[in-house]
Amino acid sequence: MRISSLLFLTFLAGIVQAQDFLAMFKPFLGGGGGGGNPFANPQAIGGLFQQFAGGNGGGFGQLLAGAMAPKPAPAAAGPRSAPAPTNEDYNTDIDVPAPKAKARAAPTPRRAQADAPPVYRQPRTKAEKIERFRNIARTFSPFVYEVNTTPAPHFDNFIWQQNAPAVTPEPFTFAPFSFPTLATVAPPAPGPGGPTLEPFLPTTASPKLLAHNTARMIREIASFSDGGRSRDQDFGAVQTLMQAFFEAVSSGNNGGAGAAAGAGTALGDAPMLQAHRDGTELGANRALTNKLFESDMVLTVKQMKAIVLAAQEARNPHGRKKRKVITGSVYRWKSVIPFRFKGGDAKWKKLIREGLGLWEKETCVRWSENGPGKDYVIFFRGSGCYSSVGRTGGSQLISIGYGCEDKGIVAHEVGHSLGFWHEQSRPDRDDYIHLRKDWIIKGTDGNFEKRSWEEIEDMGVPYDVGSVMHYGSNAFTKDWDQITIETKDSRYQGTIGQRQKLSFIDVKQVNRLYCNSVCPVALPCMHGGYPDPNNCAVCKCPDGLGGKLCGRAAKGTDHDKCGGELTATAEWQEMVYKGKRTCNWKVKSPSGGRVRLVLTELRYQCAPACKAYIEIKHNTDFQQTGFRVCCFNKTYDVISDQSEALILSNANIVDYEVSYKLQWIQDNGKALPPPKPTSTWVPGKENRPFRGVENSGGTIEKFILQAIPKIRDSHRPLESITSIVAEYGLATLLGISHNGK
């Protein structure tokens, strides 16, 4: 007891001697509002804190009001933008460089005097101590509090506004403390500046955090792209032009079933904009809808102005035309393209190199990691999948973020950096696809605008629904069960949006733009082939064709076991395949007539954009991708436009066996015959080409069975029983039904 009293007296003495002790707690005590006696109402802990809060002149109310005051309002979209939030606001592993602050000049040290007293660290002032304690309190304060709703900051979800209305917070009130459950702060209501967007990863984040996600993308663009750092050229100016463009071309989607199903929906509706893995970059970028042009293109002010002017010229056909200002040779790289990594782990970097390797394998374009040059590309793991278009000067970016981890998506974004736009923006797209505008998200119509022939360079190649640069079927859809792009020929629906490989036309465009002078000697290549810039002695052939001049079927993974040349005759022929190989078949009619193909059976994994598939090329131009089938719901009956047709079976990327049955004949008007006995070639297993199908028996089996003596004599019971048993056993062995049919 005496020890306790002694400790208590020592504590009181320390209080008297501490000159700054009461000053440190002065902000917690009641001020002009009347203060509060901490022991006046000791019935509850919550009451104790309420008394500490005091009146309007001081207490925890004033302290927490400062700690929880609304952050600065976002800045308006315009040519200049305020810095976006720092990296700590986001779940990322990259290091986005912050804008460099102006360095302060270090004070010149004074020369020490011989008789000068030693210099010690100056003690903190009262104000510094108070501020330090406030910072600690903001971090560790356990109080439960409720926010009096005040007008939310004015923001439009993609850039901070500079002239936001001032918001004066009302005093905070406190609810009784309830241990251990802590209440959460109510998020601010969406401001009138625009709808909110759902973040890339599905969460229940507040609109303020969603605005941060988009602001982070703008910070990335400003940090990694030199093209947007000059005055009136930053991405804020681009977005101002882009939003005006979207509003000008928006159709409103006011009619049709899609409009009725989507009544009341808006661009910012959260469920509609959550990320969706559809195998394309558009699915991963849903949260950035209308913040990037056509979902994944970072344009310069010059490029965006050209698009706006072209849209105006399209509505005024008598005006002056702008030519080739946004793509093609205007933004072509000069030689080897330097690139650098910013952050990322080894697996992510390997994926980038594989995507670049797809282009290097098929073209003369080469990429140099950390190579020299003032113009270069920075790969980083950003807010989504997006890229600059063409060479824009200085450093430019390609973001391969979470959800974009596919080498086909990498190849797509690299295609943009080489100077190419989306395939469906070509002027001739209406000959191949149809837009279902009723199902397009309202306000995103501008992402489907066609370019004019004056704006683009098609490099003399036809439209290709199988291009790696083509939108998928569900681009900008308000309902994932409904497609927005429908192919005119329904058989090609499973072809668009593929990200498995570069198409022949993708490669040919790049080679014509970058490699046209590599091979000085022309070759008489067939079917649209051309000298291969990686080997000028042979032709670069369309998919499915090979040989020096593209005159025969290309070799598959096992050319000796599947693939080759087939001849169509006046009689039906049939092929049944089962395995996991890539095979290429060329079917030709020797008399110059057309070829009829019938696909009667198919076993592949069904997908919106086929990964493993049967591809049939039956048109006159073998450069274009054929129609790909992986979802079998009907028999495909095709007649070729010429005397040849190609069948490509792609199954080497799957871990299961695929199978299909194909019949062909020289087209002469004959009806498809009933199924005949066929030979099923199963690589690596026993093959019996004489076996019948469906237990009906073939010619050889029936001949063997009929050659057995049939004894049915009641006077010879032993021989009769032996004959019946032998006939039954042999029929079972040969796969023939026991009724003899």
Swiss-Prot record:
Domain CUB: 550-648
Domain Peptidase M12A, first and last residues per copy: 324-516
EC number: 3.4.24.-
Region of interest: Disordered: 71-122
Gene3D superfamilies, alphabetized: Collagenase (Catalytic Domain), Spermadhesin, CUB domain
InterPro entries linked to this entry: Astacin-like_dom, CUB_dom, MetalloPept_cat_dom_sf, Peptidase_M12A, Peptidase_Metallo, Sperma_CUB_dom_sf
Glycan-linked positions: N633
Residues of the active site: E413
Biological process terms in GO annotation: proteolysis
Disulphides: C364-C515, C385-C404, C519-C539, C541-C550, C562-C583, C610-C630
Annotated Zn(2+) binding sites: H412, H416, H422
Regions of compositional bias (Low complexity) in chain numbering: 71-85, 97-118
Domain EGF-like: residue ranges: 539-550
Gene Ontology MF terms: metalloendopeptidase activity; zinc ion binding
Keywords for this protein: Disulfide bond, EGF-like domain, Glycoprotein, Hydrolase, Metal-binding, Metalloprotease, Protease, Zinc, Zymogen
PROSITE patterns per the UniProt record, alphabetical: ASTACIN, EGF_1, ZINC_PROTEASE
Cofactor binding comment, as recorded: Binds 1 zinc ion per subunit.
Obligatory cofactor(s): Zn(2+)
CDD domains given in the database record: ZnMc_astacin_like
Biological role: Metalloprotease.
Entry protein name: Zinc metalloproteinase nas-30
